[in-house]
Amino acid sequence: MPFDVLISNQKDNTNHQNITPISKSVLLAPHSNHPVIEIATYSETDVYECYIRGFETKIVMRRTKDDWINITQVFKIAQFSKTKRTKILEKESNDMQHEKVQGGYGRFQGTWIPLDSAKFLVNKYEIIDPVVNSILTFQFDPNNPPPKRSKNSILRKTSPGTKITSPSSYNKTPRKKNSSSSTSATTTAANKKGKKNASINQPNPSPLQNLVFQTPQQFQVNSSMNIMNNNDNHTTMNFNNDTRHNLINNISNNSNQSTIIQQQKSIHENSFNNNYSATQKPLQFFPIPTNLQNKNVALNNPNNNDSNSYSHNIDNVINSSNNNNNGNNNNLIIVPDGPMQSQQQQQHHHEYLTNNFNHSMMDSITNGNSKKRRKKLNQSNEQQFYNQQEKIQRHFKLMKQPLLWQSFQNPNDHHNEYCDSNGSNNNNNTVASNGSSIEVFSSNENDNSMNMSSRSMTPFSAGNTSSQNKLENKMTDQEYKQTILTILSSERSSDVDQALLATLYPAPKNFNINFEIDDQGHTPLHWATAMANIPLIKMLITLNANALQCNKLGFNCITKSIFYNNCYKENAFDEIISILKICLITPDVNGRLPFHYLIELSVNKSKNPMIIKSYMDSIILSLGQQDYNLLKICLNYQDNIGNTPLHLSALNLNFEVYNRLVYLGASTDILNLDNESPASIMNKFNTPAGGSNSRNNNTKADRKLARNLPQKNYYQQQQQQQQPQNNVKIPKIIKTQHPDKEDSTADVNIAKTDSEVNESQYLHSNQPNSTNMNTIMEDLSNINSFVTSSVIKDIKSTPSKILENSPILYRRRSQSISDEKEKAKDNENQVEKKKDPLNSVKTAMPSLESPSSLLPIQMSPLGKYSKPLSQQINKLNTKVSSLQRIMGEEIKNLDNEVVETESSISNNKKRLITIAHQIEDAFDSVSNKTPINSISDLQSRIKETSSKLNSEKQNFIQSLEKSQALKLATIVQDEESKVDMNTNSSSHPEKQEDEEPIPKSTSETSSPKNTKADAKFSNTVQESYDVNETLRLATELTILQFKRRMTTLKISEAKSKINSSVKLDKYRNLIGITIENIDSKLDDIEKDLRANA
């Protein structure tokens, strides 16, 4: 059926209701069944949107510039499955022009094809829908254009696009009220405007309404918006600069965790008093300069003493940090700012850093109305960034820095580490490269070498720096952006066209490589990392893309990538974090590291736990192999509300991750802004501070990780933690079996008896950042009631073994140990069994062998894993044998059913053959002259015969009526004459009878008037009698004629069936019945025979 016919049929079905663009007045009308066409804008592209009120999810888009149709939306309206849509698009895309759009606004994504191609596909697959037909047949009318959808559009409110697509679309929680209030009208108006902007830019509410998912971004959104509206950027920079350096100084001076928390609280309180919420960033690592964007700035440095003094300062900082690592694990290794001797230079550098940070934070909260102001801010900050980067590069002394474009050309080359195996910087003056003499940074202190090393080396120069200035990209900014989007649209990084990728270098002049692709603030580097496109990542880094720029939710590139599975599928996450390692250790706008988000994703049921575990292992190995202290700093780093990764795992009751982080060195004593430590959170849920879960922390993966970490730092910490007097015995625990994990087996030992468990098993080693089990349990042993929280909603649903490890039972255990010293072991065991029947269950816990000096106390809360393995195996064998028996019986039953089905199929085939022969015989018996080959021919023959029979009936009836017409007329005439004669004879005697009594009445004769009246009355009676008699006779005649006609019909019907009767029909049916069906008809035959008899 052609497309035009489909459209015309659809119009006929709708009573010729033409679809026209609605006017703005119709936008406020209630729901209707007519399609609506509006103009909307997605990613700076105008489209026609067609939908029906109340069914906004069924929408089809058509681009205004070229009339291309989103065919994916058409197939969705036709209710094609995803598999069917994919097959159709793969089949049809080979012969037609198409364009795939990925990323950006969700509703805009899909496959776009020209209008004619869309009509062809709709015609081919017979898709009939008013929305599809309306958008395909729509013609633009300049006099009545479609309205442009406003912000308060119905579609905007009810569209599914407003739903969150990520578990980290966090809800903004309430903040403290400002103590100081202003009474001026301008301040009030500014506050109202700030609240309005804050409501516009407020993140979508999270579906995981848990305490864990309330991110630190809540403390700075409102305050930052007020800063932008009041144009108070100078005060913001100074305040943020002071707070950051105060925190850095506290940590670098070996201050303990309590001092950091007090400093953090004071910052938090001062931030609200000053209408600004400062962000704690003690782990701020400044970007190391790579290539330079501005090549026209003079690079000569007349003062060579600056670089010498700066080199001396670097050595001092590195030596002091290495010496302090043995004493305190919370020190930070901070890259110095450069040899800025004067106070003015330092102040200028601090302002640059503060501006860069504030710029990233403002980009995350500004709306679409402030794009012009943001562009100006971008240009000024970028210019200042490049100038400052040149200053840093003239003085910075980097020993081993890999050349990014070399790894781009040869992906097999590995990146050189910044540090040697001992964790200190190497003081070589040259950069080692694989067969290349190009230097990224040079430490030679003459002017010529500095000029040579400061040039930006490109993949095209390859040592020929003289031709670098001649390279120029002739593409426009829009074409350059489109090229990047084309490369991003490739589903796999291996499909990237290398020639197309090479056209990106160099970027057009004054082009902002950090431009935002979508309305969520993502840069090309964000999507390149999320799509695991390593060649594009390397090219963007070569073009000076800012790896630390955050989107509007505050995520950097690595954080964006962990929400997708592409890096895992492409096996590219290790290489990506080696390129963007700065993102692993630099906090984002939320004050968080990527590791914080991984902890949250580990409890998200929509994420594959194997992928999240793989990401987590890669980050731990990457940080731990370079510097174990750096790994511990990241594990203990607090976000804006003071939560470490260990806090998040404790709040989610994620025992597996909790045990693992404690094993790797995470501290359980750090307090967040709610004055809660991970240990207190675990105790709040009646769980020991060391953590307890179905999987303990001394797994094979963690032991393997410990072997892969730098041996010097690892064994130094092990020797420091081991002391002769603390030979702690670790209770052995059975490890759970996870089918999706790497560890599928565990070394299970025989459970210890009660006599083997002594007091030393409940002690904790004196390692740093560890929790003493005796101290915690003694402090909590006075609690007589269990504590619940929003995480464990119902105490009845809590596993019983978790409650067995409560402080109350610990108090009983300590009392039993003291009684054990006074009484004999046999008597004491009998008494303890009466007092506490669960004691034997708690103390007899099997375990695994593990390093005794590195692990905290572990106690499994799940009693089902404490049973001996032999019992579990016996039960499993019993279940397997029962299942085998049941399956055998089912298989036998199925075999019998198969045999029966095959026999019935063969019988049906025989019956079909018999019926076919009977039909042929019936055709042969009926057909005399012309053969009958099918049922349709037989039906046509029957129709012809019946029509012929009807015509013969009519002819017979007419002949009967003609033969009886004369006789009928004669009979009627005779009857009429008889009636007339009877009337005359009867009228004369009546007159005589009336006239005879007249003379006898003397009174009547004397009155002539009475005589006339009687005569008149008699005449009237006679006339009425005649009329009634005539009507009676006419009615009788009519009835007789009707009976005659019915008799004629009966005669004709009998004549037509003279050769057939009911009995003959029954006999014919009996002859045609097969032997199988004759039994069912015997009863009817017997009834008919008895009735006739």
From Swiss-Prot:
Superkingdom per UniProt: Eukaryota
Keyword set, alphabetical order: ANK repeat, DNA-binding, Phosphoprotein, Repeat, Transcription, Transcription regulation
Record field: compositional bias (Low complexity): 179-201, 448-457, 846-855
Residues with the Phosphoserine modification: 255, 806
Ranges of biased composition (kind: Basic and acidic residues): 818-837
Keyword Phosphoprotein: yes
Entry's Gene Ontology molecular function annotations: DNA-binding transcription activator activity, RNA polymerase II-specific; identical protein binding; sequence-specific DNA binding
Record keyword Transcription regulation present: yes
Biased composition (Polar residues): 152-172, 458-468, 1000-1010
GO-annotated cellular components: chromatin; MBF transcription complex; nucleus; SBF transcription complex
ANK repeat intervals: 520-549, 641-670
Entries under Pfam families matching the protein: Ank, KilA-N
GO biological process terms held by the UniProt record: cellular response to heat; G1/S transition of mitotic cell cycle; positive regulation of transcription by RNA polymerase II; regulation of DNA-templated transcription
Domain HTH APSES-type: 37-147
Annotated region described as Disordered, given as residue ranges: 138-210, 448-468, 813-855, 973-1017
PANTHER family in the cross-refs: ASPARAGINASE, REGULATORY PROTEIN SWI4
Comment field (misc): Present with 589 molecules/cell in log phase SD medium.
Subunit structure: Component of the transcription complex SCB-binding factor (SBF) composed of SWI6 and SWI4. Interacts with MSA2.
Function: Part of a complex involved in cell-cycle-dependent transcription. SWI4 and SWI6 are required for formation of the cell-cycle box factor-DNA complex. The repeated element in the upstream region of HO (5'-CACGAAAA-3') is called the cell cycle box (CCB).
UniProt protein name: Regulatory protein SWI4
Gene expressing this chain: SWI4
